[in-house]
Amino acid sequence: MVSSPVASRIDAVSRFAREHGWHLMFQDRLGSGHPFDWVGDGVVATIRDDRRQLAYLRHLASLGIPIVDMTCDRPDFPCARVSCNHVEAGRLAAGHFLERNYRSLVFFTIDWGNGRERFWRGFSSAGSPGKWVFSAECPNARWNDWGAVSNWLERKFASAPKPLGALTYSQAESVLLLSAARRLGIRVPEDLGIVSGGEDKALLECQPVPITAVDMDMGRGAYEAAELLQRLMDGEAAPARAVEFPPRRIIARRSTDATVASDKLVRAAIELFASGLKSGVNVESAARALGVSRNTLNRRISAELGRTASAELQRQRLMMAKRLLADPKNKVEYVARMAGFSSASHLGSALRADCGLTPMSFRM
């Protein structure tokens, strides 16, 4: 049996099942407390704070049925675990914001728990971000009262510095944050950058401003969880500690498609870089267009962003390439040309140096 609504997890466990002759039952919510007419040998689950689910899983464990959890939300529940390293995911999100020069950061979540605490630990390693926890500040409100959450966010936004980079724990929280910001006239990404702490392409791409996400490689985690469950069903002892794997990458979308700069010359240079990639803009031509010397432009960009003008231009090329690679219809040669690389191999070398992936592996 598998309990998980995430498509990549379902696909991965289904693949393992086909390869190993499993018969599957999927159950997103337990409803009355147990899956209808299910008798089986093992469970891959996402264990949450659900009283009925916990009671049923305890019952299965008492019968000797092995369970593998794909989350880290309930470390107190005794079972095997395979999950992404949430601390590293938080660090990855912080680095993404800092690369874009967002200096004021906040972690927003509806509730608190072990997974969120681990995200926070990684995110806060990059500085001193704020922490917005709805349940802590509004303990008498229901977590799914979106009107109450939206009104609370309005109060938080009123006193928050801008531009602000916000990491959310879940995809739904990132959509809620975007909706509240748009209702209040807060520009995304110019005034507010948003990163979701989990990827859901169907949800995050279908927003008025598509939302950047940490790719937690849930498909890999689900496949490894299924492999572990098979070993447990074959009689192997459960690992003494949770199995963790690193987050795969940041999937950059428009919600962080900005580089924050207070220097007007630097902002103008960034806009020139971004708009002139296809035509082969370089630092020299940008400096001429802005009426300054190359040295002046380089000095001002370095002072504002902490990197050279050439490094910022290369970063803009890679940002464009990554956005285009996200669409499988775009051939690598087309992506290279549109992003200002001389060839597909030039793009491949730059991408490998940046994140260790080839163009084809990046889009997988």
Predicted features along the sequence, with ranges:
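Bacterial carbohydrate/catabolite-sensing allosteric modules
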Residues: 1-47, 51-289, 298, 315, ...
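Basic/polar phosphate-binding segments, predominantly the helix-turn-helix DNA-binding elements
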Residues: 283-313, 336-361
